[in-house]
Amino acid sequence: MCIRDSHYALASQPNNCSSVSEHVSIVREAPSLEEACIHSGSVICPFPFTKNGADVSVENSIYRFSIQTLLHLLRPGQSLFAGGIPPSFKKEAAENNVAVFDYADDISLPVYNSISTAEGAICEAILHSPFNLHKSRCAVLGFGKCGHSIVYRLKGLSANVSVFTDNAEESARASVIADKSFPLKSLSDHAGDFRFIFNTVPAQFINEETLKNVDLSALIIDIASSPGGVDYDAAQRLGISALHCLGLPGKYAPASSARHLKQFIESKLYLS
């Protein structure tokens, strides 16, 4: 992570700003978070902004700092960009005349993000299963943006796809491109039918009762935000392979993801 404008950067890892310098006019590494904030008109943070509700997300815990520390360093007239910003942080920042822009509030970013997420989820499935996706029976839990993107790409790989959702509109849309659609409450009854299960729902529908019915050769790819939608302790006890795959866009399509964030940030800066 770099907190920067076009002049200063605070790197979360040594030499982490070298690649940034290729794309902006001047980049100077700041010796501290305070120094970076003082000399920056805009502060750019990651998506998610925080994973535990207390600290800004960083790759290395050595460089951890709290969101409250950052909040107290922001000054009136600055802009802060991040994804999934807690409402309390937004409120306090606004009271201090700091403009806050949340990636999650943009209409287009979640759509682009879902594409990278879907491709990453499928990559994880290919990497961790000895079976082809081709002609395999796959379950996708949820049919929001990420669920839709996963289903669309699985069908492109000739997989047999069933969608589980309790939303009537989602169920109707799923029936257009998926092979079958079921209510989420029926997941336990059908869990043993699938070789791959992709979860996008941020609630624990894949509980111990459901896991007992999952085939031992199946693979569960869970992309739901923490703590995820799987009872991981039960999965381990039962010998079920379940992976909690977060940050897939940054892992599998960092350049594309960064480009979309850059466009979002620039659009807000030009308007302000």
Can you name each region flagged by the protein language model?
Residues 1-6:
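Conserved small/polar residues in nucleotide/adenosyl-binding loops
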Residues 7-23, 157-177:
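NAD(P)-binding Rossmann-fold cofactor-contacting core
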Residues 25-34, 180-186:
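Short acidic-hydrophobic, aromatic-tinged amphipathic segments that line or gate anion-handling sites
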Residues 45-135, 245, 264:
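Glycine/serine-rich phosphate-binding loop and adjoining beta1-alpha1 elements at the start
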Residues 50-52, 65-74, 174-250:
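Rossmann-like adenosine-cofactor binding region
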Residues 84-101, 223-270:
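Rossmann-fold NAD(P)-binding glycine/threonine-rich loop
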Residues 146:
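Hydrophobic/small residue at the entry helix of a nucleotide-binding pocket
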Residues 153-154:
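Aromatic pocket-lining residues of Rossmann-like dinucleotide-binding sites
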